[in-house]
């Protein structure tokens, strides 16, 4: 049976990935080569504005990794970029859930390092499930949406830091990054953060009343 690149011949270059995104990533080579401008791109159909296209599809810093490869090696570059994004989403979610664990499940000071490690390892299925959820696997064909999945756990971590009255840079920096990397997905993340904040305020208030 057919397998997937790089082990077999089947690649992710189907649908929009083949018809749109591959030429867009190729256009970055012309941009850094000085053949085109960030303001006007001759390789875009009959020529046209490039800023809008760049902001929507290519603003992620991951996009520039493709310029380290020749155009002929773009399948490998996009494969590595996709794997990197999915892996990083698991890493950032791991940071978030470990923060929550430490916040609400503090272990006694005399707890051994082995038991602390074991406690954190029990959380491992959560970031794995987050990284390999159906959304990520589906949108591996539209990889500009994956940056939001990477940054969302950091945004939620920032909300938790705000609730703890810590520095708001924990929230501002990932929020700025997600708006720059892909402004289309950023408003969805913003709405989710607002709902998450409301949920956390309600649960905090409920716990406060219960303690009284």
Enumerate the predicted regions with their spans.
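Membrane-interface coil-to-helix junctions
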Residues: 1-90, 128-149
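Transmembrane helix-loop junctions and nearby membrane-interface residues
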Residues: 2, 68, 100, 201-204
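Membrane-embedded helix bundles of polyisoprenyl
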Residues: 86-99, 116-202
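Basic polycationic patches enriched in arginine
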Residues: 115-116, 209
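Membrane-interfacial entry segments at the cytosolic side of transmembrane helices
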Residues: 170, 206-212
